[in-house]
Regions:
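Short, positionally conserved secondary-structure boundary motifs
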Residues: 1-40, 71-72, 95, 108, ...
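Short, hydrophobic/aromatic-rich segments at coil-to-beta transitions
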Residues: 30, 59-64
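A structural micro-motif recognizing beta-strand termini
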Residues: 34-39, 53-55, 67, 90
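Short, well-ordered loop/turn sites that connect or cap secondary structure elements
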Residues: 43-44, 58
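Well-ordered beta-strand positions in beta-sheet-rich domains
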Residues: 49, 74-76, 96-98
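Glycine- and charge-enriched low-complexity intrinsically disordered segments
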Residues: 79-118
Length: 118
């Protein structure tokens, strides 16, 4: 029977984790957002902590925090060549949302990282 060699965590430690240094590029424009709901499952789970940067451009396929009226939501941004904007959920139980000119709509920031809790 083979036994794996004893692993010493200290042999692989690079140093202390500094989440501000490692995950935040624009401190004055970065916010943490806690996820409520399951529209982005299985990719993002309820309770996950999202790190959102307002200075990073949202591009096709970006996960974004958007505001429609007074409601904020996490969605995947889909930009069509004809200028149409769609907001997509990862969870197939939710229908896509087409953004129209009469909507009070804003991309509030781009999600850069998600911290999920086990």
């Amino acid at each position: 029977m083979k036994i794996a060699p004893r692993w010493q965590p200290t042999q692989h430690v690079e140093g202390r984790i500094d989440l501000n240094r490692d995950l935040i590029k624009h401190p004055l424009a970065t916010f943490y957002v806690r996820v409520e709901g399951d529209s982005m499952k299985p990719r993002i789970h309820e309770g996950a902590l999202l790190i959102m940067d307002r200075m990073v451009e949202a591009t096709e396929g970006s996960i974004v925090i958007v505001r429609i009226g007074t409601d904020f939501m996490v969605k995947k941004l889909h930009l069509e060549q004809d200028g149409q904007i769609w907001l997509l959920s990862e969870n197939e139980a939710y229908l896509p949302i087409q953004i129209t000119e009469d909507m009070d709509f804003e991309v509030w920031g781009r999600v850069m990282n998600a911290i999920d809790f086990l």
